[in-house]
């Protein structure tokens, strides 16, 4: 999921 990638970046 793209959301997972965004959470990791944050």
Curated annotation (Swiss-Prot):
The keyword Secreted applies. Keywords: Secreted, Toxin. Expressed by the venom gland. Its main location: secreted. It is found in: Secreted. One of its GO terms (cellular component) is extracellular region. One of its GO terms (molecular function) is toxin activity. The keyword Secreted applies. It comes from the Eukaryota. This is Toxin To83. It comes from Tityus obscurus (Amazonian scorpion).
